[in-house]
């Protein structure tokens, strides 16, 4: 995961920042239960996964708490948009040598929020090292897929899966405050 941010102190102990995060690989696992067909055949239980790539754009409010010795704890709350891209994948049924489940490549913007805690240690008055733990939640991530129609032995569109995905994020970084 790669992240960058730029912010502005709007009041003592309160700052706003714009952050952009790129998450190159998030694996979404799926499990297809076995299915008994009318003609006595059985599609076996299948476990698979697809890859999700996301770009997260957030507007955050950061509140610095009272110093504890030389450390400054802080709280982060934010909201924004996540661009989610689901990679295509499929599962094959060896008996008929055909795909019976296929995830489509999709791309969608999702409403996102995050909340977190962090701690900063100042190295100089303008430079600090930070450690953060955040929870990011993206709503209504859409996964489009096809399933096998046994009458036509063709893949047919199925109802989309809409999931809320939450990701825990831990980070270490530096903050440089421009002296104005």
Swiss-Prot record:
It comes from the Bacteria. This is Uncharacterized protein RP788.
